[in-house]
């Protein structure tokens, strides 16, 4: 077991490099019928179909394992860390750069289709709008995140150094951005809400209903989650039936039996607050164009100063795909979830309420959050340009001859039309230092 545990990081690294070098062409290079297909798990309109399966059930169905002891994962979706890192709380943080932003370089596999890439970018946009976290194009940085459609939904906790893998299989994206947000919170250094040290005041773990051998996934731990009060509505909370043996609840809320746990829709207020506290995001962190967010200290939702660049680009993509999609395709009608609909954090559960119906309602269109129409100010933005601009797909380190050329995402952003208000698309990506 010890040998296998030490080999898993190397195995994941090799699989990641293989996926990057053998990735399929992007959707923009497909002809005709490619743009008319609808990925499994989505409606023709592009809205995600709600599934009963959460992260543990998805991984149990995709990853063959007998017990957690034989797995490279702990708590269902966390890559097993080395023993000394288990004792660490804050030394695996991502560093803060110039301007008060925390930049996390990322690389996206070519195997994702356009709709899946849009879901991932939507999750990036939520962090950009509410925190000082910025996911930027990989351009030779030493530490970066490689996002791949491997078997399951999993990631490591915090910055591990070098390339670290985040797996988001197609099944993980069927509900929309929720599972992506969950795994990215792990990347930022956060563990599961139901495993925090004070959880017994808020939930009861039904040990008799846990799948035999999987009890280890419910061990309490000291973690960065303790920066805020316990939150039933956290995107880091597992649902009632996690690792259930006979279909009975394994996690039972104590304060109210009807509260919804395990939501996979938005970052909750406490999720945003804990990110801002761990990374010391200032009250107002403007970017190079004077935009940013304001963190309110009274526990209420964070109020963005303006719509982020990524949100504007997502709007433009939605508008563009709606007008240029081939006949019969309805992917252009996808409803992109509005950001900022996070549920209220539970400062004290008895006095707080949580609307289950809020999760069942369709997400608010981004157009409703902006006075300008979708795609305004981006007349020359083509669907192909945007798909190239969404994410870098090939590490420059693998192709030395490309070192003097701009990264695909950078080159595409530079060819985009200016956004309203003189905001240059992808400006924070162009600021990433080159080797």
UniProtKB/Swiss-Prot annotation:
Taxonomic lineage from the root: Eukaryota, Metazoa, Chordata, Craniata, Vertebrata
Cited InterPro entries: MetalloPept_cat_dom_sf, Peptidase_M12A, Peptidase_Metallo
Biological process annotations from GO: cell adhesion; fertilization; negative regulation of binding of sperm to zona pellucida; positive regulation of protein processing; prevention of polyspermy; proteolysis
Biased composition (Low complexity): 318-329
Active site, per annotation: 183
EC number: 3.4.-.-
Residue ranges annotated for the Peptidase M12A domain, each copy included: 85-282
Keyword terms: Cell membrane, Cytoplasm, Cytoplasmic vesicle, Disulfide bond, Fertilization, Hydrolase, Membrane, Metal-binding, Metalloprotease, Protease, Signal, Zinc, Zymogen
Residues spanning the signal sequence: 1-23
Species the sequence originates in: Mus musculus (Mouse)
Catalytic EC class: hydrolase
Annotated Polar residues bias: 340-355
Protein name: Astacin-like metalloendopeptidase
Ranges in coiled-coil conformation: none
Gene Ontology molecular function, alphabetical: aspartic-type peptidase activity; glutamic-type peptidase activity; metalloendopeptidase activity; peptidase activity; zinc ion binding
Cofactor note: Binds 1 zinc ion per subunit.
Localization in the cell: Cytoplasm; Cell membrane; Cytoplasmic vesicle, Secretory vesicle, Cortical granule
PANTHER family listed in its UniProt record: ASTACIN-LIKE METALLOENDOPEPTIDASE, DISCOIDIN, CUB, EGF, LAMININ , AND ZINC METALLOPROTEASE DOMAIN CONTAINING
UniProt keyword Transferase present: no
Tissue expression: Ovary-specific. Expressed in secondary, antral and Graafian follicle oocytes. Expressed in the egg cells. Not detected in two-cell embryos. Not detected in naked oocytes, oocytes in primordial or unilaminar primary follicles, or in any other ovarian cells at pre-pubertal, pubertal or adult stages (at protein level). Ovary-specific.
């Amino acid at each position: 077991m010890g040998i296998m545990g030490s080999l898993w990081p190397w195995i994941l690294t090799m699989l990641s490099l293989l996926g990057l070098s053998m990735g399929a062409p992007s959707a923009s290079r497909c002809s005709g019928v490619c743009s008319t297909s609808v990925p499994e798990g989505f409606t023709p309109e592009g809205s995600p179909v709600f599934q009963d399966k959460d992260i543990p059930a998805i991984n149990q169905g995709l990853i063959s394992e007998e017990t957690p002891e034989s797995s490279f994962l702990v708590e269902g979706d966390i890559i097993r860390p080395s023993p000394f890192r288990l004792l660490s709380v804050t030394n695996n943080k991502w560093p803060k750069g110039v301007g008060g932003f925390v930049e996390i370089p990322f690389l996206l596999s070519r195997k994702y289709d356009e709709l899946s890439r849009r879901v991932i970018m939507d999750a990036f946009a939520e962090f950009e709008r509410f925190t000082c976290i910025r996911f930027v194009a990989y351009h030779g940085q030493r530490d970066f995140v490689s996002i791949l459609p491997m078997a399951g939904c999993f990631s490591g906790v915090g910055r591990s150094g070098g390339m670290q893998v985040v797996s988001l299989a197609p099944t993980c994206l069927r509900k929309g951005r929720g599972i992506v947000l969950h795994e990215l919170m792990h990347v930022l250094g956060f563990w599961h809400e139901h495993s925090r040290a004070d959880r017994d005041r808020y939930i009861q773990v039904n040990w008799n209903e846990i799948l035999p051998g999987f009890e280890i996934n419910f061990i309490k731990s000291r973690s960065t989650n303790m920066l805020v009060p316990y939150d039933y509505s956290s995107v880091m909370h597992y649902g009632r039936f996690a690792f259930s043996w006979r279909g009975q609840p394994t996690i039972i809320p104590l304060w109210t039996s009807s509260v919804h746990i395990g939501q996979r829709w938005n970052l909750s207020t406490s999720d945003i607050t804990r990110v801002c506290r761990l990374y010391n995001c200032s009250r107002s962190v403007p970017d190079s164009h004077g935009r940013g967010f304001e963190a309110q200290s009274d526990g209420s939702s964070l109020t963005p100063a303006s719509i982020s660049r990524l949100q504007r680009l997502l709007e433009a993509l939605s508008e563009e795909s709606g007008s240029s999609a081939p006949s019969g395709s309805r992917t252009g009608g996808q409803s992109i979830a509005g950001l900022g609909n996070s549920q209220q954090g539970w400062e004290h559960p008895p006095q707080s309420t949580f609307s289950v119906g809020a999760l069942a309602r369709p997400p608010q269109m981004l157009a409703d959050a902006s006075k300008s129409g979708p795609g305004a100010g981006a007349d020359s933005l083509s669907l192909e340009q945007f798909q190239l601009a969404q994410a870098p797909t090939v590490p420059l380190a693998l192709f030395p001859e490309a070192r003097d050329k701009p990264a695909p995402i950078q080159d595409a952003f530079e060819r985009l039309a200016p956004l309203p208000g003189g905001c240059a698309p992808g400006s924070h990506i162009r600021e990433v230092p080159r080797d």
